[in-house]
Amino acid sequence: MNNNIINLIAAVVLSLSIIFGWQYFFVKPEQKKQQQRIAMHKSENLNKQKLKALAEPASDIAVQEASQVQRIKIESESLTGSIALKGLRFDDLILKKYKQDLSQNSPAVRLFSPANTENAYFAEIGLVSNLNSVKLPNSNTVWNSDSEVLSPEKPVNLFWINEDGIKFLVTITVDKNYLFTIEQTIINNSDKELPVQSYGLINRKYISLEKAVNILHQGPIGCIDENLKEYSYDDIKDKKSTKFALSKVDWIGITDKYWLSSLIPDKSSRYSSNFNYALKQGTERYQVDFISPVQVIKPGENLSIKSRIFAGAKKVDLLDEYEKSYDIKLFDRAIDFGWFYIITKPVFYAMNFFYGYVGNFGISILIVTVIIKLLMFTLANKSYRSMKKMKNLQPEIDRIKNLYNNDKARLNQEIMALYKKEKVNPVAGCLPILVQIPVFFSIYKVLYVTIEMRQAPFFGWIKDLSSPDPTTIFNLFGLLPFAPPSFLMIGAWPILMAITMFLHQKMSPELADPIQAQVMKFMPLIFLFMFSSFPVGLLIYWSWNNILSIIQQYYINKFN
């Protein structure tokens, strides 16, 4: 079979594989959230039974009792919720600035929920001891508080005294965003040494992941010994427990697409940390935790330990600010910018910068695209010249192929000599595409993973740049009263992208190889179906980029 025919078949098969592969792996409808449970707590160098009891269902507040438990109300411009005085558990947290969907009556996003509720998710900071004769605060301890409300302007002070006279103090502060600071002080008024270990845990019932999980990390995550550690829920489930011996723990937590809960331990110590899974009472439970080495408090002395909990939206500038202010290494990597991090984050900064002036991320995308196009103009011009020369050389290349058809080595040698003589780079025509690939994926990542793009409108029917175009030509863009299946959701922006791509192809020099030229003619149609499920912000970028390319090609054709 002719090699060109083989290449054509391979190209068509590859294109179809991309389309259906994308549909299978990335465009599945969002699954319903499952009602399952979160994790047990384990650690080395500690009485395992005591540590396990911290997060066992038996110690959880029952559903019917949850409303009766005394609580400290949380109130800030970003958060509302409460902290249970019983067990001092952060288990009720709502993100005031974010709605669950675009509907008018949509409730705000709930991050934390009490144990034994439908979407149980909570955090704890506390103390344990391997000395059985000493009673420390635990999940059943009811703390005394000097205030009923925690706000950025008013910290809350709590205390509890055991039968030996040992006093435990906790001061909780919250900033205007999503960071809690918990300072624990132990005053040893007894006549015995007190060995303690500080711990922190985040405990969560497993829920099904959002769509497109293959291009986005969701699950346990952290920075340990200045290295980013990411584990999928399946990884932890298979291993049951992933342990790290004493090490520098900057932060560990659980991340979703847009939300993060994270423990940030005191920097004065090293910690053992664990990512755990357990199946309890028919539900799956996941937990991340850290625990310090034993610290001994002598009689008459005291010890203070400061830890933090981040629980909120993964805003880029906010994570950057915390990383710098509190020296939290790699905190911005909680946002999955992907392999092209070095490009993706600057692209986001550029979009966010122009958003500050125009107030619309869609317009910001248009401005950034113009800048990228201007930066690449010289390269595009060189590419055009190279493609033009290649087309002019095609008759001579065909002559050489006929002359040395049976001598592949001589054939390649003669063709390379021709390129050298005519000063033609055969791959120069591909350079703009190769350069644009990381830019394309960077813009896609920015649109898909950054909270700033979530529910960000453009104009008209586009209410969310991070979601696909909601219209489709198969019901005449909403004029006909029926909803086509998902693979036929081909909206106005995908169609505009395909049309502008076709027009740009018509203005560009034709490829010298007729088989490749035929394949390229099908690309707008292939891309129409493949990209219809992409975030509409990406289609706006691609369409606008095609329009600029048409203008650029007109200029190059006229002056070259």
From Swiss-Prot:
Taxonomy of the source species: Bacteria, Pseudomonadati, Pseudomonadota, Alphaproteobacteria, Rickettsiales
Membrane topology: Multi-pass membrane protein
Family listed: Belongs to the OXA1/ALB3/YidC family. Type 1 subfamily.
Coiled-coil parts of chain: none
Annotated function: Required for the insertion and/or proper folding and/or complex formation of integral membrane proteins into the membrane. Involved in integration of membrane proteins that insert both dependently and independently of the Sec translocase complex, as well as at least some lipoproteins. Aids folding of multispanning membrane proteins.
Biological process per Gene Ontology, one example term: protein transport
GO cellular component: plasma membrane
The protein's name in its UniProt record: Membrane protein insertase YidC
PANTHER family: CYTOCHROME C OXIDASE ASSEMBLY PROTEIN COX18, MITOCHONDRIAL (PTHR12428:SF65), OXA1 (PTHR12428)
Transmembrane regions: 5-25, 334-354, 357-377, 431-451, 476-496, 522-542
Molecular functions per Gene Ontology: membrane insertase activity
